[in-house]
Amino acid sequence: MIDLGISKLALIGAVALVVIGPERLPKVARTAGALIGRAQRYIADVKAEVSREIELEELRKMRTEFEEAARNVEQTIHQEVSRHTSEINERLNEALGDPASRQTATQAAEWRPAPAKSRNGRNSWRNKQLAMPKWYRRKQGVRMWAQSGAARVKRHRPPIVAAQSRGRSFFE
């Protein structure tokens, strides 16, 4: 940063007093202080954001390393399992001498795990709404269709009995 001693600050203050004047100097000093504070906060925010980005990049690298290590472990396990199954099948074929069992042994050695299924549609709003059981939706009062206020009042108003309505006439 800039080296400002007391003598330099006094010189700057004297020049500012002469140039700006004693009436406007406090207002200008407050404005300058506010601008310097904003600049310092902006610099601190930029530093924090840069450090966060660096940490995120390191985490991404670590994640890819872990995923690669997991894939390697899965492949080695699969290779060992297939090697052992082929050995077992060979010994079984030697013991039984059945040609049909030899075909199943080769098919077992060629077995590969199914690829992971994509989760298409799981994040859609409609699927989330329809995932709840109907009895739970009814009990909790989850509305599936829009209904106007008048229709809702009519739906929840108790029915008028015919005997009560005859006694209350406008003309009586």
Curated annotation (Swiss-Prot):
InterPro entries: TatA/B/E, TatB. Keywords: Cell inner membrane, Cell membrane, Membrane, Protein transport, Translocation, Transmembrane, Transmembrane helix, Transport. It is a single-pass membrane protein. It holds the Pfam family TatA_B_E. Residues 97-129 are annotated as: Disordered. It is found in: Cell inner membrane. Part of the twin-arginine translocation (Tat) system that transports large folded proteins containing a characteristic twin-arginine motif in their signal peptide across membranes. Together with TatC, TatB is part of a receptor directly interacting with Tat signal peptides. TatB may form an oligomeric binding site that transiently accommodates folded Tat precursor proteins before their translocation. Belongs to the TatB family. This is Sec-independent protein translocase protein TatB. The gene is tatB. The Tat system comprises two distinct complexes: a TatABC complex, containing multiple copies of TatA, TatB and TatC subunits, and a separate TatA complex, containing only TatA subunits. Substrates initially bind to the TatABC complex, which probably triggers association of the separate TatA complex to form the active translocon. GO terms for cellular component: TAT protein transport complex. The chain crosses the membrane at residues 1-21. NCBIfam families: tatB (TIGR01410). One of its GO terms (biological process) is protein transport by the Tat complex. One of its GO terms (molecular function) is protein transmembrane transporter activity.
